[in-house]
Amino acid sequence: DVRVPQFIPEIASGKAAKLNNKRILCVGTDMAVGKMITSLEIHKWAIENKIKSAFIATGQIGITVTGSGIPLDAYKVDYACGAGEQMVLQKSNDDWVLIEGQGSLLNPGSTASLPLIRGSCTTHMILCHRADFLTLRDSKHIKIPNLNEVIKLYETLASACGIYPKAKVVGISLNTFKLDSIAAKKAVDFLESSTNLPVTDVVRYGPEKLGLAIKQIN
């Protein structure tokens, strides 16, 4: 178990909002919808395109894969924001900081999304969604809302009435692994039409659409 805190963070103070880089957080409609792989694929794309990029793992699998990060669920709630803030501040010299997302604001069993939003003072968000999910995976009585409403929720919460950076959802990472190639293409096309955002499955089609969206939007 790698979920052992390596430092005792200070209480977060919003310092990350003063940084001049892009802080990209993957947020989700549920747990386990592809937030980690999306962040890693965008990070890889950024490096291949000569962008100075860093990746911050926030869960045990991400830490195991990359060899560093913060085990967010090992921190007491009041210190979780500070842990995220401290890691982001350490990456102040990187142009892009990809933060591995955790949980979902829609999930009643998740408390992880807000500390990452607040601690990183995120500037860009990628919404991650399973194409075959109409409800939460483990709470099937909870329907996933229209994704435009989910986008509005994350953007409103991130800015907190304008006192934090006005973070935008700049693209959607659609997990289509349960769909055949024809259904996957239709799902991507439908979401692009209904949200006016770039949509891709980063495993099936690559992350370029999302990387370009981050690059173009300040």
PLM features: residue spans?
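Flexible phosphate-sensing "switch/lid" loops adjacent to ATP/NTP-binding sites
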Residues: 5-25, 29-33, 37-218
